Amino acid sequence: YPFAFLSLDNCSHNGDKIKEAILTFADEWAANGVADKGFVDYVNDPQKVTFPWSMIDKITPRSSAKVQGYLKELGFGDTELIHTEKGTYAAFVNAENAQYLVIEDTFPNGRPALEQAGVIFTDRNTVDKVERMKVCTCLNPLHTAMAVYGCLLGYTLIADEMKDPQIKGLIEKIGYQEGLPVVTNPGVLNPEDFIKEVLEQRLTNGNLPDTPQRIASDTSQKVGIRFGETIKAYGDKAKDLKYIPLAIAGWCRYLLAVDDEGKHFELSPDPLLKDLQAALEGITLGNPDSAKGKLKSILANKDIFGSDLYEVGLGEKIEGYFDELIVGPHAVRNTLVKYVK
């Protein structure tokens, strides 16, 4: 029978990932005699079984008590937040109005006309381009920059950060000034319109209880895509970038777990957190000399950024920003005021 496995997981090339998982089971079943080789051939036949790629974009943070209150006022009954002993979580979903779903149009047995509901069907290459537009330029880099600086400046809501002229100015410059000139244009969506909606409608949405602490999670796994790809796109001109390096310096400053008032705060989870903090051990607020040579193992790490930031001419610039960010209390704010005109 012809069949399509459509993944809506929010990750790049999600169709390949579900295909790999299913083939792992199929191969093991064949090896154990549970299924014959013909079954493996069937799963591998693109005329019969497909694994379309998709790109989904709709900011959906953890369910909010504020939204729960709204729902109760409206008479919505089932609003309990369920936490299980195994750490799983079941609840209502609070999300934004904006939504994008782009799907590779490979369905061997036909499909519903979901384009009538706004779904974009296209080829695999275009799905990938939409993903790159969002993740490398128009949304995710802005999210990460405002997350690390938001934590340093004591914010707990993304919408509140958008009222901060320096944070708002920083992400506008990262997006419009440094991102759009090298953006991947997918054709089916306009990058400039997309980023305008992000900045003017999505991130400013006070009814969406998204937090910089959530977005700051796993930053070491994100910066290579969110900043590293744009750095690569600039080639020899990467050394002229100003605001992406400032965002990276902000992440390094964030890793000290000391806010702009000089008070300790809890860092969000990250698989490399212990190693990153060990590399920065000994750096103290108020003593820029204590940072000498400490950032190199992070900024030169190609596994993190996709390139050695010293080799592309940004390492020393980021170190300079970082030194300014640790001059003392309020140095984060003062540095942003200085560079974000």
What do the PLM-derived regions correspond to, one by one?
Residues 1-341:
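Substrate/ligand-engaging "lid" and interaction regions
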